Amino acid sequence: MGYTGPLYIGKDTHLLSGPAQDTALEVLLANGVTVMVDARERFTPTPAVSRAILRHNAELPGGVTGTAGDRADGIVVTPSHNPPTDGGFKYNPPSGGPADTDATSWIADRANEYLRASLKGVARCNLNQLGQPGQPAASLKVPFDYLDMYVCDLGLVLDLETIRGAGVRIGADPLGGASVDYWGAIGEQYDLSLTVVNPSVAVSYTHLRAHE
């Protein structure tokens, strides 16, 4: 789409999202894209990726709605609520998402062109050899603490002090999804009476099958 800023990437808890993210990194880094990856090597919910994009772009001339070429965008590797046999790439534009049909249609058309050509022309690198001769610079892969950024910024938009003062007891069920680490961190950061009632990670998404 012509953006030259960093790309923020995250993944959900599906079993194949990790390998899919690695494949995306191989292609992105091979094409000289600076990629912001989760410093904890954990799961990243879409709102955290969106917030990171907005924070970066807000510092540019014209802000989030500007036209600066070095705006950031992002990818969340997730098929959302679909079964574990499915995979997906969700593109987040500089606005933080969701992408409009112009963007998604362009991406789909380009991907199908490569598939029809048996991936001819797709550059890839070896993630274990970054910085070595013939490989991208290791500096293109940048650790980024999505969790800390998101949890700290949450207090800018929610009156969590009032919630804490009211003594509200909160039960949070991540439903096997990417927010599994975030709820506990929110409760700890803001001293809330918050219990994560089901912190298990459902890589097979069996909790969905229970409702089929």
Question: PLM features: what roles do these ranges have?
Answer:
Residues G2, G32, N57, L158-T162:
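Structural motif corresponding to the C-terminal cap of alpha-helices
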Residues Y3-G5, R71-A72, A166:
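Short coil/turn segments at beta-strand junctions that form active-site/ligand-binding loops
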Residues T67-G69, T85-R209:
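Gly/Ser/Thr-enriched, mixed-charge loops and adjacent short helices
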Residues M1, E41-P45, P143-V151:
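Phosphate/oxyanion-binding active-site loops and adjacent basic polyanion-contact surfaces
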Residues G2, E26-L29, P133-A137:
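Generic detector of short, locally flexible boundary/turn motifs and exposed helical patches
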Residues P6-D12, R169-D173:
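Short glycine-rich or small-residue beta-strand-to-loop segments that form or flank ligand, phosphate
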